[in-house]
A protein has these predicted regions:
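Trp/Phe/Arg-rich N-terminal binding region typifying the photolyase-homology
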Residues: 54-66, 79-126
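Charged, often Cys/His-bearing segments associated with DNA-binding zinc-finger transcription factors
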Residues: 1-44
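Short acidic (Asp/Glu) and glycine-rich catalytic loops that position anionic groups and cofactors
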Residues: 18, 50-52, 113
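A broad, structural surface signal
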Residues: 36, 40, 70, 74-77, ...
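Active-site- or DNA-interface-adjacent structural scaffold in DNA-acting proteins
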Residues: 104-161
Length: 161
């Protein structure tokens, strides 16, 4: 039994929300920052339905959207923080809330949820390849340069098989 066996795919609404941090604070955080980049491009980099193979189709509770967790893993690598600190930043850091596209008062995931998602990416080649393709897409658009590109290279080293 794996982490997601009892969960259905959680989805984000394709319609924007006026109350999310990215809608209200993107300029404050910096549109050209790594956080601003993820706020603008995260939905194109990681689509929830692309991770559907990791989830049960028709029963169980709804999961945290995998697109949100994928962005959280990038933020964690970028900021070089532990799982516990990643959870705390998702809960309280304005930059992370903007990048994740969540409301200010949202606590989006548990530490164990982030850990299980990472484990599924490592275990499932298809999910790992999807993650890599998304990062290559961003690189091709010219969005991953300098420090941002080093984050991608760090992910590649972690997932070498």
């Amino acid at each position: 039994m794996h982490c997601w066996e009892r969960e259905m795919l959680g989805k984000r609404s394709p319609q924007g929300d006026l109350f999310t941090a990215d809608a209200q604070y993107l300029k404050f955080v910096g549109e050209d920052s790594f956080y601003g980049f993820l706020a603008r491009e995260g939905g194109r980099l990681f689509r929830g339905e692309d991770f559907a193979a990791l989830y049960c189709e028709d029963n169980g509770r709804t999961s945290v959207p995998p697109s949100l967790l994928a962005i959280a893993l990038l933020l964690q690598t970028h900021d070089r923080v532990s799982d516990g600190e990643a959870k705390a930043r998702a809960d309280f850091d304005l930059r992370w809330k903007v990048a994740l596209g969540i409301e200010i008062d949202t606590r989006p995931f548990a530490k164990s949820t982030l850990q299980c998602f990472r484990a599924q990416l490592v275990i499932h080649e298809g999910a790992r390849q999807l993650f890599r393709r998304s990062l290559e897409y961003a690189k091709g658009l010219g969005h991953l340069k300098g420090r941002k590109m080093r984050v991608v290279q760090s992910w590649r080293r972690r997932w070498r098989t």
